[in-house]
Every structure is written in C-alpha cells, then in structure tokens.
Amino acid sequence: MGVSRVLYVEGGTPLKGELRVYPAKNAALPILAASLLTPEPITLVEVPRLRDVEVMLELLAHLGTQYAWEGRTLHLQTPEIKSTHAPYELVGQMRASFIVWGALLARAGEGHVSMPGGCAFGFRPVDQHIKALEAL
C-alpha cells in the first residue's frame, strides 16, 4: 500500500461573503456551442458581448438557433438543427467555432465543419478533438 500525502491547513478566519465572477469569452463559447444539444430554451446571464461571441451566435443561428439579448442576458433555443454545415465564412473567423462539431454529431448524427480560423496566436492543434470524435 502506498503512502498517502495529506495537506493540513489551519486557517484563521473562515471564508464567507460574495464573489462576483466576471464573464469570460473562453467560458461562454463552449456553453454557447453546447446549447445545440437540447431543443429546450436556455438563459445565460452575464454573457460578454464580444466579437467572438457574436460570431458564434451567427454560426448557431445558421445551424438553427434562435436567440435574443436582454441586456447582458442571452436567451437561446434550438428547436431543430436546420443545417449540419458550418459555413467557412463564420468558422474561419474564430478558432472556437470548431467546437460545434461535437454538438452537431450528438444531436443530428452528422456535422460538417471546416478547420477553424481565428487569430494566429501560436500553434494550437485540433487533433485531440478529431481523435475524440472519431472514437464516438
């Protein structure tokens, strides 16, 4: 049997109170893509109104999502997948657009998504995404 390591922390004052969590694009984009998985209405609060979020919403609308902003609250629903083809004009604008592929496969049984575009911020391969989808 191995030796287990334990870290004991003797604190002073217990933590209590509230913490405001600010919206982040990198959290919002996968949640938006996941909205394709259900026909039910979804409400997201404190969604950042950034270019990548707007491009993702354009892509989702092309695929069948209806959405409406109410301040920083976003209401969306995808009653049906109207297209399984993500147009390159949108996919090419943003790296995160690639993540709609899994949701399309799960909900519609197929998905056609070009290799993602976006910024040239270093080397960011998508091979792990492809391997995961091939394993389905």
Question: What feature does the model see in each segment?
Answer:
Residues 1-136:
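Structural preference for solvent-exposed beta-strand-turn elements
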